[in-house]
A protein has these predicted regions:
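N-terminal, positively charged/glycine-rich alpha-helical extensions of SAM-dependent methyltransferases
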Residues: 1-25
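Conserved alpha-helix/loop element of class I SAM-dependent methyltransferases that forms part
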Residues: 34-52
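Class I SAM-dependent methyltransferase SAM/SAH-binding core
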Residues: 57-59, 63-111
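A short acidic, Gly/Pro-enriched loop at the edge of an enzyme's catalytic core
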Residues: 113-122
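A short SAM/SAH-binding and catalytic strip from SAM-dependent methyltransferases
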Residues: 121-133
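A short glycine-rich, Lys/Arg-flanked "PGG" loop and its adjoining helix->strand segment in the class I
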Residues: 135-150
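Short, glycine-/aromatic-enriched active-site segment of Class I SAM-dependent methyltransferases
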Residues: 152-172
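Conserved Class I S-adenosyl-L-methionine
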Residues: 195-257
Length: 257
């Protein structure tokens, strides 16, 4: 997994094919490797109520483009954490990092060492999956929140293509039963969940169509590994949703003041 992301972040910044893909699918090229379009990012801002005076940490920030966009939208100071050195290096070259509005650090979601009461808002945009122990990770994220702090998670849960249909636990699909919901509950955290599955389905269809249109460009740039990864994601999500075995949610913890 780490090898893939090292290769991914070394190539996509300069890829015209991937930039076009992100623009057509997500509404803007933020070098997305995930499932969040501008609409979902807007909902994340709205539900967490990020203010210009606040400090936010983005867990799994990649090369920082999404953190930069969210900081531009809200005026807040963002710290991005990622475990890929190449991604962090590129993030530190962003204009916001140079003027002090953005900071980026290397870190592992399974070995978090964050300051207690260090942030007003914690964001996880399709990154909690990398945790090997959701309850422990949530506990550490909760500890880094200041009084009145909030957390926002864009999160998908469903059958992966390699899991037989009859072996996937359907009972974990409702919003109060997903692994993330169980981890939040185990930590005594109240939350709300917004169902984004219909949006996820439409975006998966768009991804497949756009990738088909751009296949030649990905091949010319010799980054078919990115094309194949994105196509596999889209196909897997479409199949799982059509089987009734996939959900996408926005989980919000705490209330903006």
């Amino acid at each position: 997994m780490k090898d893939f992301y090292e290769k991914y972040y070394a190539r996509v910044d300069s890829s015209k094919a991937h930039a076009t893909f992100c623009e057509k699918v997500f509404g803007m090229n933020l070098c997305q490797h995930g499932f969040a379009d501008l609409h979902q990012l807007g909902l994340l801002i709205e539900t967490t109520g990020i203010k210009a005076t606040e400090k936010v940490i983005d867990i799994g920030s990649g090369n920082g483009r999404i953190a930069e966009y969210l900081s531009d939208r809200t005026g807040a100071h963002f710290t991005g954490l990622d475990f890929i050195p190449e991604a962090v290096m590129k993030a530190r070259q962003l204009p916001g990092a140079k003027n002090g509005r953005l900071a980026f650090i290397e870190g592992d979601i399974n070995a978090l060492d964050l300051p207690r009461n260090g942030y007003d808002v914690v964001l996880s945009i399709d990154s909690i999956y990398f945790s090997s122990d959701y309850p422990t990770t949530i506990s550490k994220l909760d500890e880094t929140l200041r009084p009145g702090g909030r957390m926002g998670f864009l999160y998908s849960h469903g059958r992966e293509p390699w899991v037989p249909k009859d072996q996937f636990p359907k009972e974990t699909l409702p919003p109060d039963s997903t692994p993330l919901a169980q981890a939040l509950t185990a930590n005594g955290l109240a939350y709300t969940a917004m169902d984004l599955t219909d949006r996820d389905y439409e975006l998966a269809k768009i991804r497949k169509r756009v990738l088909t249109e751009l296949e030649g460009q990905f091949a010319e740039e010799d980054i078919m590994f990115v094309y194949e990864n994105r196509l596999g994601e889209a196909s897997g999500i479409l199949n799982a949703i059509e089987e009734g075995l996939h959900r996408r949610y926005l989980y919000s913890v705490g209330r903006p003041g």
